[in-house]
Amino acid sequence: PILDGKFEILDIIPEGAKRPNFSKFVLRNDINGETFECMPVGDASTRQSYLINKDKFIGKIAFAEFRCRSGVKEVPSHGNVIKILDNEPTRLPNNNEEES
């Protein structure tokens, strides 16, 4: 099954040594606050633009699709950022934070 969710964008980093100009998103897990990495969809210029303009996206909410939650930390895996949501709160509630 394909699952989806909304995740806070913590950072946008280079994809790796083979494609350092392409972006990879660092996201906060919606169920426990752990972090995970997720590749964006899009053509080469879109994926480069996320990295070049990362300050415009950090703190926003990403909508991502993924295949499963993996490991002890239950982070989404085998997923992609589908789009950036502009009309969402800039911070999602974290289930681990105590209410004051």
State the predicted function of each range.
Residues 1-75, 79-88:
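Nucleic-acid 5′ end/cap handling module spanning
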Residues 92-100:
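Acidic, low-complexity intrinsically disordered tails
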